[in-house]
Amino acid sequence: MEGIKLNLCLLCIFTCDILGFSNGNIYNAHGSAYAGASAGAYKTLPNAYPYGTKHGPVYKPVKTSYHPTNSYPPTYGSKTNYLPLAKKLSSYKPIKTTYNAKTNYPPVYKPKMTYPPTYKPKPSYPPTYKPKPSYPATYKSKSSYPSSYKPKKTYPPTYKPKLTYPPTYKPKPSYPPTYKPKPSYPATYKSKSSYPPSYKTKKTYPSSYKPKKTYPSTYKPKVSYPPTYKSKKSYPPIYKTKASYPSSYKPKKTYPSTYKPKISYPPTYKAKPSYPTSYRAKPSYPSTYKAKPSYPPTYKAKPSYPPTYKAKPTYPSTYKAKPSYPPTYKAKPSYPPTYKAKPSYPPSYKPKTTYPPSYKPKISYPPTYKAKPSYPPIYKAKPSYPPTYKAKPSYLPTYKAKPSYPPTYKAKPRYPTTYKAKPSYPPTYKAKPSYPPTYKAKLSYPPTYKAKPSYPPTYKAKPSYPPTYKAKPSYPPTYKTKPSYPRTYKAKPSYSSTYKAKPSYPPTYKAKPSYPPTYKAKPSYPPTYKAKPSYPPTYKAKPSYPPTYKAKPSYPQTYKAKSSYPPTYKAKPSYPPTYKAKPSYPPTYKAKPSYPPTYKAKPSYPPTYKAKPSYPPTYKAKPSYPPTYKAKPSYPPTYKAKPSYPPTYKAKPSYPATYPSTYKAKPSYPPTYKAKPSYPPTYKPKPSYPPTYKSKSSYPSSYKPKKTYPPTYKPKLTYPPIYKPKPSYPPTYKSSYPPRYKKKISYPSQY
């Protein structure tokens, strides 16, 4: 087709020139075919004549092919036939030079004009917009979702299974009173830090994590779900955007008025006022709903008012209950029957599928996971998963699941064997090209969008491999130029003398070196002629090649050699005058200015960087113990000052002189009484946690060694398993840092 178009266009131009039709650029029959077609397609044709639009792509290969013929027409002999026309062509040589800029420009530009209307609007804009049209269809499912949110209201009849399920949930309200065990429970908060591995068991757990999405009574899908997050943004203006929100919110507008239908609604929700037990009187006070604003303390009822939605934000304690309901998984251990549900839960996860048989058959519906899109909260997981990643950032808790997610990523193929194996496909994201209709895969191929330049003639893909400019050496005549060209470029002047050996060199191209223009052989290469228009990016090397050596020596030296060198070579000239040790030492160079104060030499301990935080904590522990910091200068005696320090209150007046021996009497005496009053602030409830006393015993025992710290300093050495940097640093301040830190101790003593 291109050959037909080209022949027709050349014939048209040829006939126009014979008939005397000229558009200001084409002047004769022959000049129209070559010089006119090239020069006419430069500027005036695209606007003055329809060739610029349709036939421009055709003239591009013509131009690129015959652009060597800018030097070509004198060799062609048109000057002998058309000397005045040759003058005009020489007058167009500036235009050709301007087109040399256009050779860079139109091949870039008109390909943009050829295919981008198909794709630049599509790839750039559909990810923003076609998800929107595809999403409004799903957004109708959202409109079905607010209606399905009414199935949430109908789901509370299944909320009786929630009432069967809230046995864990009633431990939540019973658990906020146990919230004081939660402050005592921060030792298990370290078990939270130990819990992220169990949070990997959340990764094995997430199959039930969909019950988490169902577990918050679809409440966290409201929070984590971006559309409802928009409802948050629309929710502070609360009514206008909710008025603009689908009709489902109009039941919300009727819903505060039908707040009494909330009281009629509570077949599930009367259990809510029943478990607050104080709120039974509050629903009995529908009129005292005004008494709720009269209750500034019932501002908690205001959180329970917005639909208890803000109640959870007002439950900062229950916000800990949110990580604690991931830990309520541990609360299940604290809840003995559900503790059995724990061991049956992660391993016998299938018993879980048998556990809520009416509920996890929904999880057995992951083949009917489309029903999950129909199921509103999991459908939220759908609009979260087409982004898949943004929705995961919307899972702020599950976003931590992402960090734990890559290691347990295999566990995710175990978990979402139905679908998230597709997220395991993202390496097979080409399956996503197969996964949209492969057309969006083309949209996802804007990098392969150059493959669409390979799409129109498949030659622009060859312009797409100007890296295959080395393929130009693979091209035989330029292959000669490359062996003579790149490094043996000086050898080319040697070949200039042996240039006669060049015609003797390629026996295959003796005729071609006899035709130094080598372009009559190129017209003898009409198929390779098309390869030449496909070859234009290397063609620039061709016009740089007819100069052959002046431009190329300036070009590869200035560009290729420098581009090959600039990281190494520019770094070498830039740094050796400035600082050779700097490029050699750029990391250690920082260590050098940081090294003299010896603190950044401590950053040189970043492997012992735990020793660093242990070191500043001790140093901060000195400001945190400013009295004990003085005890640390007294502490190089290490022992007398601290016995003088703890007993300071009574033992000093009682035993000033026999003090060291009475220090033994003091551990014997205050532990009987004073250590007990000192411990109730430290937690005797912690020793009263013999069940939790394992972790807490390891933890408050760390406090007891702190108070018995000078003698039980070796128990700090037993204490390291919690903080090896800490046991390492109290010793290391004396052992690893003895010359430095003892100099500091000698400083206070000298001070």
Swiss-Prot record:
Keywords: Hydroxylation, Repeat, Secreted, Signal. Produced by the byssal gland. Hydroxylated on proline (mono- or dihydroxylation) and tyrosine residues (to L-DOPA = 3',4'-dihydroxyphenylalanine) of the tandem repeats. Residues 109-732 are annotated as: 63 X 10 AA tandem repeats of Y-[KR]-[APTS]-K-[KPMSLTIVA]-[STR]-Y-[PLS]-[PASRQT]-[STI]. Residues 158-359, 397-636, 660-751 are annotated as: Disordered. One of its GO terms (cellular component) is extracellular region. InterPro entries: Adhesive_plaq. Residues 1-20 form the signal peptide. Sequence repeats lie at residues 109-118, 119-128, 129-138, 139-148, 149-158, 159-168, 169-178, 179-188, 189-198, 199-208, 209-218, 219-228, 229-238, 239-248, 249-258, 259-268, 269-278, 279-288, 289-298, 299-308, 309-318, 319-328, 329-338, 339-348, 349-358, 359-368, 369-378, 379-388, 389-398, 399-408, 409-418, 419-428, 429-438, 439-448, 449-458, 459-468, 469-478, 479-488, 489-498, 499-508, 509-518, 519-528, 529-538, 539-548, 549-558, 559-568, 569-578, 579-588, 589-598, 599-608, 609-618, 619-628, 629-638, 639-648, 649-658, 659-662, 663-672, 673-682, 683-692, 693-702, 703-712, 713-722, 723-732. The keyword Secreted applies. Its main location: secreted. It is found in: Secreted. Residues 158-167, 185-262, 288-343, 350-359, 444-486, 662-677, 691-721 have a biased composition (Low complexity). Residues 21-41 are annotated as: Nonrepetitive linker. Residues 168-184, 678-690 have a biased composition (Pro residues). Almost exclusively composed of repeats of a decapeptide. This is Adhesive plaque matrix protein. The gene is FP1.
